[in-house]
C-alpha cells in the first residue's frame, strides 16, 4: 500500500499497481481512507462518513464531499450502501440518480459506469475492492465475519461476471481491518465459521483476558491491521 496526502490532513491508502496506467491496463481511482481528515467531533472524530450514525448530518455531508473530491468526483456521484452484514451484492445501474438520495440494503456495490465512485464503510470489518480493468467492471465489498462466511465476496465476483467481467481478469485489493489481537468474538462466531470451514478452527485462539471468548483472525488473514479507530471509514473505487 502507498499513502498519498490528498490534502494536508486527508491521507488515502491505495494500491500502487492500480494507480498507474500501462499499455495493457488503465489506471483506476481508488482508495482506503482513515479516520483522519474530516470535521466530525467526539466519538465520531473525524472523517465519519456513516449516515447511519448519530453524527451531525452536515458533518457527514462534508466528510463525504472531501472523500469524493479526493477521488475526483462530485459528492452526488459517491454511492454508498446501508450495510447489514449480508451476502448481498447489487448493481449500480445507469439510471441511478443522486447518491445522496439512496442507500440500498446490501454489502457490495458493482458498476460498469465510469462517472461514479462506489464506496463501502468499515470500522473493524474488511474492505475489499475489485476491478476488471480489461472489461470496465468494478466492485466494493464490506466483509465482516457474517458476510464473509455467508459469501459476500463470491456474490460480488458473480455480480461482476454477470455484467461483463471475467474471472481471469478480476483483481482484488484487501484494505485495512482489525487485527486478531483486538478482535474478540464469542461462540456464535466460532461455531458458525468452523461449521462452514472446519480448517478455520486454527484461526481462533482463546482470549487470555477472557477465557470464555476467542480472538479471531478475520478472513483468516488481516494484512493491514488497525488498532482502535472506530469511525466509519470509506473505501472506494
Q: Model regions: which residues?
A:
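Single conserved hydrophobic/aromatic residue that forms the stacking wall/gate
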Residues: 220-237
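Active-site microenvironment for binding and transforming phosphate-containing groups
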Residues: 1-222
Amino acid at each position: 500500500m502507498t499513502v498519498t496526502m490528498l490534502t494536508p490532513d486527508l491521507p488515502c491508502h491505495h494500491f500502487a499497481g492500480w494507480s498507474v496506467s500501462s499499455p495493457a491496463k488503465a489506471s483506476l481511482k481508488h482508495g482506503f481512507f482513515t479516520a483522519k481528515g474530516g470535521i466530525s467531533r467526539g466519538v465520531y472524530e473525524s472523517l465519519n462518513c456513516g449516515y447511519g450514525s448519530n453524527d451531525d448530518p452536515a458533518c457527514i455531508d462534508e466528510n463525504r464531499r472531501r472523500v469524493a473530491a479526493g477521488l475526483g468526483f462530485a459528492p452526488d456521484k459517491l454511492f454508498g450502501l446501508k450495510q447489514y452484514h449480508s451476502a448481498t451484492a447489487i448493481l449500480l445501474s445507469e439510471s441511478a440518480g443522486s447518491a445522496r438520495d439512496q442507500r440500498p440494503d446490501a454489502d457490495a456495490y458493482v458498476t460498469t459506469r465510469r462517472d461514479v465512485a462506489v464506496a463501502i464503510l468499515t470500522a473493524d470489518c474488511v474492505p475489499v475492492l475489485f476491478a476488471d480493468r480489461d472489461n470496465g467492471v468494478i466492485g466494493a465489498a464490506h466483509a465482516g465475519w457474517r458476510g464473509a462466511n455467508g459469501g459476500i465476496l463470491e456474490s460480488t465476483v458473480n455480480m461482476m461476471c454477470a455484467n461483463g467481467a471475467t474471472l481471469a481478469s478480476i483483481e482484488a485489493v484487501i484494505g485495512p481491518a482489525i487485527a486478531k489481537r483486538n478482535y474478540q468474538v464469542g461462540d456464535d462466531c466460532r461455531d458458525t465459521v468452523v461449521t462452514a470451514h472446519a480448517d478455520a478452527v486454527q484461526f481462533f485462539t482463546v482470549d487470555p483476558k477472557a477465557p470464555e471468548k476467542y480472538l479471531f483472525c478475520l478472513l483468516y488473514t488481516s494484512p493491514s491491521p488497525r488498532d482502535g479507530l472506530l469511525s466509519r471509514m470509506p473505501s472506494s473505487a
